[in-house]
Amino acid sequence: MKYVLLLTRGAWQDEASDDDKAAIFGQIGEWFAKYYADGTIVEAYKLREPHTATTVVLDRGSSTLIDRPLLEAKEAVGGYAVVNVPDLDAALELARSFPMPDGKVEVRPVDEM
């Protein structure tokens, strides 16, 4: 079954030293490489900073562009991974293994469109 892991930015990204960030990003890179190699990760992307987002608001045939993220949130999504695992428990275990010091990983099942 496929799930999306939504990866939020952690405080460490703003607070850690450059050396610590480099080490953490190295661990994250190894995590992605491991799960890409065994076929668990179907695709994954790092999102650019929230200030780069443009939101299209649709309203009964008209649209408005807003130069900001869809949601004004303290915790911004920093990336996502689509994973193919047997069940929710496996997806949760994968999320628990994500190597960042703090932050959140939302696990959500997906349906094909």
What are these regions (language model features)?
Residues 1-113:
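Conserved, structured core segments of small domains
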